[in-house]
Amino acid sequence: MKKVMATGTFDLLHPGHGIYLNEAKKLGGEDAKLYVVIARDSTVEKRKRYPIVGEQQRLELIKMIKGVDEAYLGNENGDFLKIVEEINPDIIAIGADQRHDITKLQKAINKRGLKAKVERVKAYHNAELDSSCKIIKKIKKMDFKGKINDNCD
């Protein structure tokens, strides 16, 4: 059984997230276990923007996805390799649209004496709303014409 680790923000879930996680698990073969690490709010703020959905809710949502065996919040101190040491995966799956330098990451993993092999997932869901950013932009542009429920807090 191979352990596959996938990472991400997973803010405003969309089909691209599901495809990434399914393809990540396939990298480990038929009996693979998928471990998903969700970026902390503080990490997301530093790298992208303030998350819409908080880290605890994002963790709960990922745990509900079929095919995810275990899910964890990442480390707040910025040491990504600490969670890699804890999970000790055989494969770290990088999403098709994630901006990671695979060679640099593999060198850092090797330097720490870890066995994980870094692989990029090739499949990508190309659609109108295939990123959280696109979803946010669409919502900002929409004119709801007063049709938002007033009971919404």
Curated annotation (Swiss-Prot):
<feature type="binding site">
    <location>
        <begin position="14"/>
        <end position="17"/>
    </location>
    <ligand>
        <name>ATP</name>
    </ligand>
</feature>
<comment type="similarity">
    <text>Belongs to the archaeal FAD synthase family.</text>
</comment>
<keyword id="KW-0067">ATP-binding</keyword>
<comment type="subunit">
    <text>Homodimer.</text>
</comment>
<dbReference type="InterPro" id="IPR024902">
    <property type="entry name" value="FAD_synth_RibL"/>
</dbReference>
<feature type="binding site">
    <location>
        <position position="97"/>
    </location>
    <ligand>
        <name>ATP</name>
    </ligand>
</feature>
<keyword id="KW-0548">Nucleotidyltransferase</keyword>
<dbReference type="InterPro" id="IPR050385">
    <property type="entry name" value="Archaeal_FAD_synthase"/>
</dbReference>
<dbReference type="GO" id="GO:0003919">
    <property type="term" value="F:FMN adenylyltransferase activity"/>
</dbReference>
<dbReference type="Pfam" id="PF01467">
    <property type="entry name" value="CTP_transf_like"/>
</dbReference>
<dbReference type="GO" id="GO:0005524">
    <property type="term" value="F:ATP binding"/>
</dbReference>
<comment type="function">
    <text>Catalyzes the transfer of the AMP portion of ATP to flavin mononucleotide (FMN) to produce flavin adenine dinucleotide (FAD) coenzyme.</text>
</comment>
<keyword id="KW-0274">FAD</keyword>
<keyword id="KW-0288">FMN</keyword>
<keyword id="KW-0285">Flavoprotein</keyword>
<dbReference type="GO" id="GO:0006747">
    <property type="term" value="P:FAD biosynthetic process"/>
</dbReference>
<dbReference type="GO" id="GO:0046444">
    <property type="term" value="P:FMN metabolic process"/>
</dbReference>
<keyword id="KW-0808">Transferase</keyword>
<comment type="pathway">
    <text>Cofactor biosynthesis; FAD biosynthesis; FAD from FMN: step 1/1.</text>
</comment>
<feature type="binding site">
    <location>
        <position position="124"/>
    </location>
    <ligand>
        <name>ATP</name>
    </ligand>
</feature>
<feature type="binding site">
    <location>
        <begin position="9"/>
        <end position="10"/>
    </location>
    <ligand>
        <name>ATP</name>
    </ligand>
</feature>
<keyword id="KW-0547">Nucleotide-binding</keyword>
<dbReference type="InterPro" id="IPR014729">
    <property type="entry name" value="Rossmann-like_a/b/a_fold"/>
</dbReference>
<dbReference type="InterPro" id="IPR004821">
    <property type="entry name" value="Cyt_trans-like"/>
</dbReference>
<protein>
    <recommendedName>
        <fullName>FAD synthase</fullName>
        <ecNumber>2.7.7.2</ecNumber>
    </recommendedName>
</protein>
